[in-house]
């Protein structure tokens, strides 16, 4: 399992970090900036391709949802943010969002639909 997550992170973290990348090795994705909007759209596509229902709320937060089979009205939330400060690092915020998505995808693959809905 650790090997799976290590490989998944090594494949997806550079991809996610490429949006808003700057020449010094950091990235800048200020809230509602073109870089942030592009990242949101690309991350949404990846989540949808993995079988999650995706949506944006009124302020632009992105959700990926896997409906529960027994208690769908009970929702477990996990995640983080993908906006950054100027020249931010690649683990701040986006790593939490990425980790939540990868964990949900792995659990779905291993065990099928969860009893409770996860987002």
Could you tell me what each predicted segment is?
Residues 78, 88-119:
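Alpha-helical metal-binding/catalytic segments enriched in His/Glu/Asp
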Residues 5-8, 84, 92-95:
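Intrinsically disordered, low-complexity serine/threonine-rich segments
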Residues 50, 62-92:
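Catalytic-core environment of secreted peptidases
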Residues 1-23:
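N-terminal hydrophobic or amphipathic helices/low-complexity stretches enriched
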Residues 21-67:
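A non-catalytic alpha/beta surface segment that caps or lines the substrate-entry region
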